[in-house]
């Protein structure tokens, strides 16, 4: 994503997987963290001149300052940060959450706020949105008799 993808108070995104074009309002707020999309984007601006929202801030082996950060690099950095956080995971946890799990978490968070997550996530079917909204066994399921 680039800063040039922002106009008329929307972040314009063309999804890689489906090609769906989304215009997400900058005033979209995630109540769980108390930030709007505009707040997050403002944090992407720093002392490094770059057309990219997510960019390298200094020159190193993976790229020069201002260059685009590839998705695989973001996932790797997420894994490193997750591992350094020293979180105690349940003993029955068979797989630690990957970077992509944030998409499911945001789906559940925005749905609780009454936001149309099917459109927000760029899904064509409600079934796909339901899959992303799965609570991963966190909530008790009541048996109805």
Where are the regions a protein language model picked out?
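Short, charged phosphate-coordinating catalytic segments
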Residues: 1-10
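A short linear hydrophobic-aromatic micro-motif
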Residues: 11-13, 96-97
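C-terminal catalytic core of Y-nucleophile DNA break-rejoin enzymes
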Residues: 16-40, 48-80, 98
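Alpha-helix C-terminal capping segments
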Residues: 26, 44, 107-113, 143-144
């Amino acid at each position: 994503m680039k800063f040039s993808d922002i106009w008329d108070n929307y972040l314009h995104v063309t999804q890689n997987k489906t090609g769906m074009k989304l215009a997400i309002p900058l005033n979209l707020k995630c109540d769980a963290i108390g930030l709007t999309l505009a707040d997050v984007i403002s944090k992407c601006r720093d002392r490094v001149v770059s057309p990219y929202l997510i960019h390298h801030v200094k020159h190193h082996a993976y790229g020069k300052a201002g260059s685009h950060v590839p998705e695989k690099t973001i996932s790797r950095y997420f894994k490193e940060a997750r591992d350094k956080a020293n979180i105690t995971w349940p003993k029955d946890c068979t797989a630690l959450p990957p970077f992509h799990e944030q998409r499911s978490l945001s789906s559940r968070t925005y749905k609780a706020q009454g936001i149309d997550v099917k459109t927000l996530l760029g899904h064509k079917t409600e079934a796909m949105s339901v899959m992303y909204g799965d609570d991963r066994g966190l909530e008790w399921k009541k048996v109805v008799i």
